[in-house]
Curated annotation (Swiss-Prot):
Catalytic reaction annotation: tRNA(Phe) + L-phenylalanine + ATP = L-phenylalanyl-tRNA(Phe) + AMP + diphosphate + H(+)
Gene: pheS
Cellular component GO terms held in the UniProt record: cytoplasm
Cofactor note: Binds 2 magnesium ions per tetramer.
Quaternary structure and interacting proteins, as annotated: Tetramer of two alpha and two beta subunits.
PROSITE patterns registered for this protein in UniProt: AA_TRNA_LIGASE_II
The protein, known as: Phenylalanine--tRNA ligase alpha subunit
Record-listed E.C. numbers: 6.1.1.20
Compartments (UniProt record): Cytoplasm
Pfam families (UniProt xref): Phe_tRNA-synt_N, tRNA-synt_2d
Cofactors (names): Mg(2+)
Length: 339
C-alpha cells in the first residue's frame, strides 16, 4: 500500500509538470482527488487494513493528498501567470505605429454669431437671462397681452404639451420672468431656442434661435430704443450700416415697429442676399405695452421700457451666405468645417 501511494504521488507530479492549461489540471485533480479518484479509493479502503497498518497508511495517504493539493494549486497559479503574460504580450501597444486622429467637432456658425451678439450687448451693459423652453401658457401668451382667442395660440403655430404648457414660441417669457423676479432698472437679453409648428423647408424650421431684449426704467423712450438698435447694428455689421423703422403691430408693445438695416453684403445697392431691395428686415421692436408692465407688477405710470427681438438664424444665413436653414441643424461636418 505504501508503494502504491508513492507511485500515485510520482505519477500525479509528472502529469502536473506536463499540464498546459487549466483543463489539464482539472482532469488531474479529478483523476486522483475526485470522488472516484485513485487516492480517494485508497482512503475508502482503509477499513480493510489491520489496526497496526491503518494509522501508518492513513498518515501517509493524508500527506500524499496534501502534497497533491498543494502541487495542483501551484500548477494552477503557473498556468494562470503564463496565460496572463501571453495576453499582455498580445495587447502591447506598438508606440512606434502612427496614431489615429480623434474625430472632433467644429465651431457652429450659429454659435459664432450668437457669441458675437452676446458680447456686443454685454459691452452695452446688458445681462443675459435664460428660461425654460417648455413654458407655461401664462408666461408665453397671457402675460404678454396675448388673449385666449389670439391666432398665435392656434395649433398651426404652437406646439402644445397640454392645455397649459407649450414649447415656447418666443423668448419673451424670459422677459416676463425677469420682470416678475427683479425690480427696475432692467437691462437684459434672452437668447435661445424657440419652437413653431412649421413644416421644415429651405427657409422654415420648427426650431430656431431668437435673441430678444428688454430695458425697463424711468423715462425710457422710443429714442432710447432706436439708439440701442443702431449702436448694435453698427457694431455687428459695420459703421456704415443704416437703419429705418416701419410701423407694425405686436400685442406686447405699443407703439410697435419693424426695423430694417442696409444690406451688409451690398451696402444697400441691391443684391441676391437682399433680393435687390437694398434692405434686410432685422428687428421687431416697440415700447413695452402698459398691460404687460401691469401683469408683471410694474407701474406703467412710473416706469416705461422697450423690447426688441430678432431671428438669429436669419442673420447667420445672410452673414454666411447659407441658403437652406436645415443645414444649421443637420450637424454635417462637411458643412461645419467651412466656418
Amino acid at each position: 500500500m505504501k508503494e502504491k501511494l508513492e507511485a500515485i504521488k510520482e505519477k500525479a507530479l509528472n502529469e502536473l509538470k506536463s499540464a498546459v492549461d487549466k483543463k489539464n489540471i482539472e482532469e488531474i485533480r479529478v483523476k486522483y482527488l475526485g470522488k472516484k479518484g485513485e487516492l480517494t479509493q485508497i482512503l475508502r479502503g482503509m477499513g480493510a487494513l489491520s489496526s497496526e497498518e491503518r494509522p501508518i497508511i492513513g498518515k501517509l495517504a493524508n500527506e500524499v493528498r496534501s502534497k497533491l493539493e498543494s502541487l495542483i494549486v501551484e500548477a494552477s497559479e503557473k498556468i494562470k501567470d503564463a496565460e496572463k503574460k501571453t495576453r499582455l504580450e498580445s495587447e502591447i501597444i506598438d508606440i512606434s505605429m502612427p496614431g489615429k486622429r480623434q474625430t472632433i467637432g467644429h465651431r457652429h456658425p450659429t454659435y459664432l454669431t450668437l457669441n458675437k451678439v452676446e458680447n456686443i450687448f454685454r459691452d452695452m451693459g446688458f445681462v443675459i437671462e435664460e428660461g425654460p423652453e417648455v413654458e407655461y401658457d401664462k408666461y408665453n401668451f397671457e402675460m404678454l397681452n396675448i388673449p385666449k382667442n389670439h391666432p398665435a395660440r392656434g395649433e398651426q403655430d404652437t406646439f402644445y404639451i397640454n392645455d397649459n404648457v407649450v414649447l415656447r414660441t418666443q423668448t419673451s417669457p424670459v422677459q416676463v420672468r425677469t420682470m416678475l423676479n427683479q425690480k427696475p432698472p432692467i437691462k437684459m437679453i434672452s437668447p435661445g431656442k424657440v419652437y413653431r409648428s412649421d413644416a421644415a423647408d429651405a427657409t422654415h424650421s420648427p426650431i430656431f434661435y431668437q435673441v430678444e431684449g428688454l430695458v425697463v426704467d424711468k423715462g425710457i423712450t422710443f429714442a432710447d430704443l432706436k439708439g440701442t438698435l443702431e449702436t448694435f447694428a453698427k457694431k455687428m455689421f459695420g459703421e456704415n450700416v443704416k437703419m429705418k423703422f416701419r410701423p407694425h403691430h405686436f400685442p406686447f408693445t405699443e407703439p410697435s415697429a419693424e426695423s430694417d438695416v442696409t444690406c451688409f453684403a451690398c451696402g444697400g445697392e441691391g443684391c441676391r442676399v437682399c433680393k435687390g431691395e437694398g434692405w434686410i428686415e432685422l428687428w421687431g421692436c416697440g415700447m413695452v405695452h402698459p398691460n404687460v408692465l401691469r401683469n408683471c407688477g410694474i407701474d406703467p405710470e412710473v416706469y416705461s421700457g422697450f423690447a426688441f427681438g430678432m431671428g438669429l438664424d436669419r442673420i447667420v444665413m445672410l452673414n454666411y451666405g447659407i441658403d437652406d436653414i436645415r443645414q444649421l441643424y443637420e450637424s454635417d461636418m462637411r458643412f461645419l468645417k467651412q466656418f
